[in-house]
UniProtKB/Swiss-Prot annotation:
It comes from Homo sapiens (Human). Keywords: ATP-binding, Cytoplasm, Kinase, Nucleotide-binding, Transferase. Belongs to the adenylate kinase family. This is Adenylate kinase isoenzyme 5. Residues 133-316 are annotated as: Adenylate kinase 1. The lineage of its organism: Eukaryota, Metazoa, Chordata, Craniata, Vertebrata. GO terms for biological process: ADP biosynthetic process; ATP metabolic process; dADP biosynthetic process; pyrimidine ribonucleotide biosynthetic process. HAMAP family: Adenylate_kinase_Adk. It is found in: Cytoplasm. Monomer. Interacts with YWHAZ. AMP 1 binds at residues 168, 191-193, 219-222, 226, 263, 274. It comes from the Eukaryota. ATP 1 binds at residues 142-147, 257. The keyword Nucleotide-binding applies.
Length: 562
């Protein structure tokens, strides 16, 4: 079954409406036993005649007291005996069937039912006309989404839509509407508004502005399900801007905003819940858009003008590119992708400018996830080409359940992805420049976050390549618990590389090339090793022996941090 089949099945069976109704019932009823409650709800769905009979409020009781069971005539008579006077002259009419009860629903309580149905039926954008460019701006609460979205809209002449503001205005204008009163309570507690309701409001707004060249949507989607719904019912966005900010900074900004603006969802309890929702949903959402090559990440823990400068560079490159096409993968010199064991001289002028010019992908990408990263065991493995790092990392992964990350491999994977970032990296390499440390660190962080919860720690080889990288890693993520130096002579490494050359014939494993690589390694690694020696994190391993002997030394060193 492919994605379209799955989507068609869910839509045909009314599954989204069923789940929305069940969730609304859970949030309103707050049952002690949610499993038993859901079983009773599903039984009611069968009695109603299927999912197509379920409304969003089917399981939302108008009163909180439980009605007695009505299982047949005997139960009805027992109920009537309990609540009616014994006097036979009491004037009441007996019905063979209870009169219809006016059940609250979106159709009966609002005047939007026909509009909502039309929105489901028709395309949002006229297929005969060019579709406006769509930019989605996402990030944690307090990350500056509204500020940056407005700046983007103003710079490019786009229309700005704040999903949060759409919902707040709707709640304010329909305060007597039971559905929106319920949504107001949901939002006030820090939970997400119902997905279909939010999508409907966005679609209504988009239909009102069909002639816009571009649209910036702030605060949507919040999770992968919303992203799928947006693509299914509206379109695939042209660009997703992710504003990453440290968790503590988000809290500070939200508390300050609560004092200044008094938004109902900025209360302390709701703030905690919103941050928790963001933490749970952000990584899968970012990964989803990364796989589609749509997202760019920005460090939002800076001055807003600095952040916007980086965003505007990215938007210019993505939506208004130069006419020259980027080189294809076949045009790229493979030698410009670093070997996983190679540490190179980073003295290029471009590298010195990297942090300023290439902050497009951010320096603090995962907000609250950084706290989880800092709790993980992080081990750097430093060693020259041919020192045996790759072999030993494989064995350590198997023994300890670590995740092995190689900066060279991460760069290769990124270049193969054909993302916007890969185009930028390719352009840099084609000019003969080195990939800036900011991009390498960003690739590392994304890979680490993707493995959170499934690993006991990280083995990182080929990094840091200079002291500045190590300092930046410590500042942005945290210092490693252990730095292992694979101490091996130049002669041993040369012999190993020559043997590998005879078996696999890599282009650069000639004697002359090997000598250059070793020279570059020693020149760059000596300051790095000295830096970690002063921090008492360095553990030197004699890598001259057999793989088994080296592995035993490594295990002894790693066991010391557990």
């Amino acid at each position: 079954m492919n994605t379209n089949d799955a989507k068609e099945y869910l839509a045909r069976r009314e599954i989204p409406q069923l789940f929305e109704s069940l969730l609304n019932g859970l949030m309103c009823s707050k049952p002690e036993d949610p499993v038993e409650y859901l079983e009773s709800c599903l039984q009611k769905v069968k009695e109603l005649g299927g999912c197509d009979k379920v409304k969003w409020d089917t399981f939302v009781s108008q009163e909180k007291k439980t009605l007695p069971p009505l299982n047949g005539g005997q139960s009805r008579r027992s109920f009537l005996r309990n609540v009616m006077p014994e006097n036979s002259n009491f004037p009441y009419r007996r019905y063979d069937r209870l009169p219809p009860i006016h059940q609250f629903s979106i159709e009966s309580d609002t005047d939007l039912s026909e509009t909502a149905e039309l929105i489901e039926e028709y395309e949002v954008f006229d297929p005969t006309r060019p579709r406006p460019k769509i930019i989605l701006v996402i990030g944690g609460p307090g990350s500056g989404k509204g500020t940056q979205s407005l700046k983007i809209a103003e710079r490019y002449g786009f229309q700005y839509i704040s999903v949060g503001e759409l919902l707040r205005k709707k709640i304010h204008s329909t305060s007597s509407n039971r559905k929106w009163s319920l949504i107001a309570k949901i939002i006030t507690t820090g939970e997400l508004a119902p997905q279909e309701t939010t999508i409907t409001e966005i679609k209504q707004k988009l239909m009102q502005i069909p002639d816009e060249e571009g649209i910036v949507i702030d605060g949507f989607p919040r999770d992968v399900a919303q992203a799928l719904s947006f693509e299914d019912q509206i379109c695939t966005p042209d660009l997703v801007v992710f504003l990453a900010c440290a968790n503590q900074r988000l809290k500070e900004r939200l508390l300050k905003r609560a004092e200044q603006q008094g938004r109902p969802d900025d209360n302390v309890k709701a703030t905690q819940r919103r941050l928790m929702n963001f933490k749970q949903n952000a990584a899968p959402l970012v990964k989803y858009f990364q796989e589609k090559g749509l997202i760019m990440t920005f460090d939002a823990d800076r001055d807003e003008d600095e952040v916007f400068y980086d965003i505007s560079m990215a938007v210019d490159n993505k939506l208004f590119p130069n006419k020259e096409a980027a080189a294809g993968s076949s045009d790229l010199d493979p030698s410009m992708i670093l070997d996983t064991g190679e540490i190179i001289d980073t003295g290029s002028d471009y590298e010195d400018q990297g942090d300023d010019q290439l902050n497009v992908f951010g320096e603090d990408t995962m907000g609250g996830f950084m706290e989880d990263l800092r709790k993980c065991k992080i081990i750097f493995i430093i060693g020259g080409p041919g020192s045996g790092k790759g072999t030993q990392c494989e064995k350590l992964v198997e023994k300890y359940g670590f995740t092995h990350l190689s900066t060279g491999e991460l760069l290769r994977e990124e270049l193969a992805s054909e993302s916007e970032r890969s185009k930028l990296i390719r352009d840099i390499m084609e000019r003969g420049d080195l990939v800036p440390s900011g991009i390498v660190l960003e690739l590392l962080k994304e890979a680490m976050v993707a493995s959170l919860g499934d690993t006991r720690g990280f083995l990182i080889d080929g990094y840091p390549r200079e002291v500045k990288q190590g300092e930046e890693f410590g500042r942005r993520i945290g210092d490693p618990q252990l730095v292992i130096c694979m101490d091996c002579s130049a002669d041993t490494m040369t012999n190993r590389l020559l043997q590998r050359s005879r078996s696999s014939l890599p282009v650069d494993d000639t004697t002359k090339t090997i000598a250059k690589r070793l020279e570059a390694y020693y020149r760059a690694s000596i300051p790095v090793i000295a830096y970690y020696e002063t921090k008492t994190q360095l553990h030197k391993i004699n890598a001259e022996g057999t793989p088994e002997d080296v592995f035993l030394q490594l295990c002894t060193a790693i066991d010391s941090i557990f």
